[in-house]
Amino acid sequence: MARFVVVPLLVLVSLFGLEAIQHPPKIQVYSRYPADNGKPNFLNCYVSGFHPSDIEVDLLKNGKKIEKVEHSDLSFSKDWSFYLLYYTEFTPNEKDEYACRVSHVTFSTPKTVKWDRNM
């Protein structure tokens, strides 16, 4: 009988322990195809390895939020950390600057990562 009480208690303690663990997101910004000025492409922001799941991701053009952005469903890895992909169509050129801005409880201020067209 004691075994049936201890096991559920251990499960509850484990679950509450997961909520206390915080991991900052890894942010990767890249284009689907190699950058070619004037040719349509997709800008991607892959955010991974974060916990808890509450996160805000914005794609930026010249520091301003891009409104027409799509994203994958929130998913989790074997280690219970989360990941997401945000993406939008764009046409690269020499003058515009693109970036991904992420807000998460592990950051004191939002973190912005610029797109490097040479990556």
From Swiss-Prot:
Disulfide bonds join 45-100. PROSITE patterns: IG_LIKE (PS50835), IG_MHC (PS00290). It comes from the Eukaryota. The keyword Secreted applies. The keyword Cell membrane does not apply. GO terms for biological process: antigen processing and presentation of peptide antigen via MHC class I; immune response. Residues 25-114 form the Ig-like C1-type domain. Residues 1-20 form the signal peptide. One of its GO terms (cellular component) is extracellular region. Its main location: secreted. Pfam families: C1-set. It is found in: Secreted. Keywords: Disulfide bond, Immunity, Immunoglobulin domain, MHC I, Secreted, Signal. Belongs to the beta-2-microglobulin family. Heterodimer of an alpha chain and a beta chain. Beta-2-microglobulin is the beta-chain of major histocompatibility complex class I molecules. Component of the class I major histocompatibility complex (MHC). Involved in the presentation of peptide antigens to the immune system. This is Beta-2-microglobulin.
